[in-house]
Amino acid sequence: MSLPASFDLTPEDAKLLLAANVHLGSKNVQVHNKPYVYKTRPDGVNIINIGKTWEKIVLAARIIAAVPNSSDVAVCSSRTFGQRAVLKFAAHTGATAIAGRFTPGNFTNYITRSFKEPRLVIVTDPRTDAQAIKESSYVNIPVIALTDMDSPSEYVDVAIPCNNKGKHSIGLIWWLLAREVLRLRGIIADRTTEWSVMPDLYFYRDPEEIEQNATEDVQGEEVEEVQAAEAETEWTGETEEVDWAESGATPAAEDAAASNW
């Protein structure tokens, strides 16, 4: 698929894709994913052609932008590394996020409280989100999926070849997809205008690590306050003032001077 010149992959975006290890695929290759393999390293890891990854991101964004009601787009991620990304994507584009376990019957059983009728489904991993893809096939909902080289492509209409197991890779793909959708909708003025949202916002963060860092920061501040208080007491300690006139006592220096006379 050839893109217009204005949609070409920029060097900055290519560097981001490489830095996030989007190009590192699995060692096994599913037959439908062979066209996306650039080459195979000596250790067996398949390198994904990021040019084709970008083409599929643009295609997926054009499909998403064509849906009149943005809430009719459902984004799913049972994989932990993709849950933060789909929530941020939904917040920026107006899509409906399904983060965590996909409840069976979400798309097929209208009796359930979580029943939805989306016009488009986007999943992070065809393996972990297999239930969402299966139900989409029952009700004829097109599916866009982030696929690794060994991912099954059954019932997937648009596959975005990438490393769908790394937290940085998953977050960056969702960020690029959201940015492209906003560009097509005209929310971002033109392709030369940078998006104010950083890719880091889409990266998975461990809640325990965040809590531990916050605790360490608080403990560090408390230690610094104690040390500062001790230093202030040591260097600015007040001395008791003595009024020699009222006490009737004379300093030792004056006594010595008087004895010489």
UniProtKB/Swiss-Prot annotation:
Alphabetically sorted, this entry's keywords are: Acetylation, Cytoplasm, Ribonucleoprotein, Ribosomal protein
User: Secreted: is it a keyword of this entry?
Assistant: no
Give one Pfam hit by family name.
Ribosomal_S2
According to the UniProt record, one GO cellular component term is: cytosolic small ribosomal subunit
Q: Name one GO biological process term.
A: translation
Task: Tell me one GO molecular function of this protein.
Answer: structural constituent of ribosome
Which residue stretches does the UniProt record annotate as biased composition, category Acidic residues? 230-244
Task: Name the segments for region: Disordered.
Answer: 230-261
Subcellular location as annotated:
Cytoplasm
Q: What is its main location?
A: cytoplasm
Tell me the residues on which N-acetylserine occurs: S2
| PROSITE patterns, alphabetized | RIBOSOMAL_S2_1, RIBOSOMAL_S2_2
Q: Which HAMAP family match?
A: Ribosomal_S2_euk
Family listed: Belongs to the universal ribosomal protein uS2 family.
What PANTHER family would the database entry show?
A: 40S RIBOSOMAL PROTEIN SA (PTHR11489)
Physiological role: Required for the assembly and/or stability of the 40S ribosomal subunit. Required for the processing of the 20S rRNA-precursor to mature 18S rRNA in a late step of the maturation of 40S ribosomal subunits.
Assembly and partners are described as: Component of the small ribosomal subunit. Mature ribosomes consist of a small (40S) and a large (60S) subunit. The 40S subunit contains about 33 different proteins and 1 molecule of RNA (18S). The 60S subunit contains about 49 different proteins and 3 molecules of RNA (25S, 5.8S and 5S). Interacts with RPS21.
Know the name of this protein?
A: Small ribosomal subunit protein uS2
Species this chain originates from: Lodderomyces elongisporus (strain ATCC 11503 / CBS 2605 / JCM 1781 / NBRC 1676 / NRRL YB-4239) (Yeast)
Q: State which gene encodes it.
A: RPS0
